Curated annotation (Swiss-Prot):
It holds the Pfam family Spin-Ssty. It is found in: Nucleus. Residues 27-38 have a biased composition (Basic residues). Expressed in several tissues including testis. One of its GO terms (cellular component) is nucleus. This is Spindlin-Z. One of its GO terms (biological process) is gamete generation. Residues 1-50 are annotated as: Disordered. It comes from Gallus gallus (Chicken). InterPro entries: SPIN/Ssty, SPIN/Ssty_sf.
Length: 262
C-alpha cells in the first residue's frame, strides 16, 4: 500500500520517535488538590456546555512558535474520559492519530465544525476483522522507489467512528496509527503472524476487579537526563497490558506494553 506523500510510518517529523518505553514502576496516581469551600459573594456565570464534537469533521488553523499558520482538516474520533479536554483526531492525509486539547491549546485557532458527517460503511469481512484484533502482523509499505518496506506491529482495535479503519502500532515506532487493514490484507500487504506459544493469561473470577493504570501519571527519563511527563489514557481491551500514553510535550499517542517494559 502507498502511504500519503509516499512516507512509511517512521518518517514522521517529531522528536523521540523510538525511546524504549515507560516502566510501570514509574506510575504515579493522579491526586486531586481541589479544596471544598462555600462560595461567598457574587456567583460566577455558568458557562454553557460545549457541543459534543465526537464524530464530527473539523478544520482549524495551527501555529507553532514563529512559524506560519497552517490549515488542518480531520475527523474527531474520541474524547478521552480521564481528560475530557483531550480529543483523538485523524487528520486528512496523515496516518497517525493525534491527541489535542482542541479548546485549550493556544496553537489551535479558528476551530470550525464542518457540516459534513462521517459516512458509515459496512465491514466487508467481520470475521477477519475480529480475527486480526490483538494479533501481531507484518505490514508492507511501498516506498518512493517502488520497493517494499516491512513493518512489524500489532493490531490493537477497530477505530471508533471510522469503522472500516483499525488502530495499529509498530515495533519500530510505538505510536498510534490507523489504516484500512482489511484492504491491505486482501492486497497481500498485511500478514497475520501465527500465535506465539506464550501461555494464555490467567482467567479472572467473575466480579474480580483488575487494577488499571488508566488515569495515572507517567514520568519518562530521556537520555539527556531531562524528564517528560504524561498520562495513561486508555487500556487496550484485546491486550490488557498494553496502554495508550499521551505525553504533555507531544501530540502523538504512544503505545506501550507496561508489563513487558517494567
Amino acid at each position: 500500500m502507498k502511504t500519503p506523500f509516499g512516507k512509511s510510518p517512521g518518517q514522521r517529523s517529531r522528536a523521540d520517535a523510538g525511546h524504549a518505553g515507560v516502566s510501570a514502576s514509574m506510575m504515579k496516581k493522579r491526586t486531586s488538590h481541589k479544596k471544598h469551600r462555600n462560595n461567598v459573594g457574587p456567583s460566577k456565570p455558568i458557562s454553557q456546555p460545549r457541543r459534543n464534537i465526537v464524530g464530527c469533521r473539523i478544520q482549524h488553523g495551527w501555529k507553532e512558535g514563529s512559524g506560519p499558520v497552517t490549515q488542518w482538516k480531520g475527523t474527531v474520533l474520541d474524547q478521552v474520559p480521564v481528560n475530557p479536554s483531550l480529543y483523538l483526531i485523524k487528520y486528512d492525509g496523515f496516518d497517525c492519530v493525534y491527541g489535542l486539547e482542541l479548546h485549550k491549546d493556544e496553537r489551535v485557532s479558528a476551530l470550525e465544525v464542518l457540516p459534513d458527517r462521517v459516512a458509515s460503511s459496512r465491514i466487508s469481512d467481520a470475521h477477519l476483522a475480529d480475527t486480526m484484533i490483538g494479533k501481531a502482523v507484518e505490514h508492507m509499505f511501498e516506498t518512493e522507489d517502488g520497493s517494499k518496506d516491512e513493518w512489524r506491529g500489532m493490531v490493537l482495535a477497530r477505530a471508533p467512528i471510522m469503522n472500516t479503519w483499525f488502530y495499529i502500532t509498530y515495533e519500530k515506532d510505538p505510536v498510534l496509527y490507523m489504516y484500512q487493514l482489511l484492504d491491505d490484507y486482501k492486497e497481500g500487504d498485511l500478514r497475520i503472524m501465527p500465535d506465539s506459544n506464550d501461555s494464555p493469561p490467567a482467567e479472572r473470577e467473575p466480579g474480580e476487579v483488575v487494577d488499571s493504570l488508566v488515569g495515572k501519571q507517567v514520568e519518562y527519563a530521556k537520555e539527556d537526563g531531562s524528564k517528560r511527563t504524561g498520562m495513561v489514557i486508555h487500556q487496550v481491551e484485546a491486550k490488557p497490558s498494553v496502554y495508550f500514553i499521551k505525553f504533555d510535550d507531544d501530540f502523538h499517542i504512544y503505545v506501550y506494553d507496561l508489563v513487558k517494559t517494567s
